[in-house]
Amino acid sequence: MVVLIPVYWYHYGPTNFLYFCDIALLLTLVGMWLDKPLLISLPAVGILLPQALWCVDFVVQLCGFTMTGMTSYMFDETKPLFLRGLSLFHGRLPFLLLFLIFKLGYDRRALKGWTALASSLCLVAFFFLPKAGATLADPNLPRNVNYVFGMDDAQPQTWMGAELYLVTWIALLVILVYLPTHFLLKRICPTPEQAAAKRA
């Protein structure tokens, strides 16, 4: 993080830290530092499945094909290789979170907490940040943060109206990502109390 934060800030600007994955990384580090299960559980319920999709999409693009377009930036040769290499934390973070969840326990409050946080981030990205395909003075600045305009940063989706897509996107995240992850973690992971008793 000592390297990643200043490098990302310089190249991508502060709005880059509004991506779910970057918020998740920051929460994970603070959670590790403070030994707080809730701070680990929040990103776990929110990004375990999306980061798995990121990994699959990256491998597909590495093989010369396109799946969702969400990792296209990793193959953008206008961006320094070192900068793109820093983004490989996406592939490691899910495994770290799983390790920490089993160690510290899964806090059931994470579902409501992450849903509120993610919804707020989506609204900020939709109303205040550049949309997909926007022409910016600095081409490195983030567009389409958290995919609120579609899965491709190069152009907005055209399946439905932008506002309807936003509402649908948030609903799908809750129904298809956060809820299943919550129930899975609730089933297979200890509670913070159980984890603490086991460590004692």
Name what the model sees in each region.
Residues 5-14:
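Short, hydrophobic transmembrane alpha-helix segments
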Residues 133-178:
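Membrane-interface transmembrane-helix boundary segments in multi-pass integral membrane proteins
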Residues 86-92, 111-133, 139-146:
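Alpha-helical membrane segments in multi-pass integral membrane proteins
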Residues 45, 49, 53-118:
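Membrane-proximal helix-loop-helix units in multi-pass membrane proteins
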Residues 180-199:
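Membrane-interface capping segments at transmembrane-helix boundaries
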Residues 17-30, 88-93:
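Membrane-embedded alpha-helical segments of multi-pass membrane proteins
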Residues 1-6, 48-57, 118-130:
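Aromatic-anchored segments of alpha-helical transmembrane domains
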Residues 13-20, 38-43, 110-113:
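Short, aromatic-rich membrane-interface segments at the entry and exit
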